[in-house]
Amino acid sequence: MNKTIAVAGLGYVGLSMATLLAQNNHVLAVDVSKERVDAVNNRRSPIRDEYIEKFFAERTLDLHATTDARTAYESADFVVIAVPTNYDPKKNFFDTSAVNSVIETVLQVGSQAQMIIKSTIPVGFVAAAREEIGRAHV
């Protein structure tokens, strides 16, 4: 049974996940960059990757990109979070603000989607997020 999957982030990880999942599911790819969104919707890869380009050209994909995160998350069964978490070696710190923002938006729209984090996060992040939001769907 096909699922509706929202993928947050159209970088290498997010675009790869969205492309593969779109073979058998309805995928809504979310990004803040209108250029990336337009490229995906026109079946052009916004990143240079031989396999993604090949899939775009040769495969039937149920893949649509948008900058409207709220609408995408609202209808999703799953939300794959693949947004940047830059590491600052001087502070020994991962900037998880983009991950937190996606989680907050999913909760704000009332989605019951299972959230899957593919971004690099520090040890204990998921447990802390579950405790903070009172929900095990992360």
Predicted segments, located by residue:
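N-terminal FAD cofactor-binding segment of flavoenzymes
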Residues: 47-48
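NAD(P)+-binding Rossmann beta1-loop-alpha1 motif at the extreme N-terminus of oxidoreductases
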Residues: 1-44
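Rossmann-like NAD(P)(H) cofactor-binding subdomain of soluble oxidoreductases
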Residues: 87-137
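Hydrophobic packing residues within well-ordered alpha-helices of enzyme cores
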Residues: 40, 56, 129-130
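Short acidic/histidine-rich motifs immediately flanking catalytic phosphotransfer sites
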Residues: 74-78, 110-113
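A structured beta-alpha segment of the ubiquitous adenosine-cofactor-binding alpha/beta core
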Residues: 52-77
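A structural signal for isolated positions on well-ordered beta-strands in alpha/beta enzyme cores
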Residues: 6, 28, 64, 114-116
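Short, well-ordered coil/turn residues at beta-beta hairpins
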Residues: 75, 81-83, 118-119
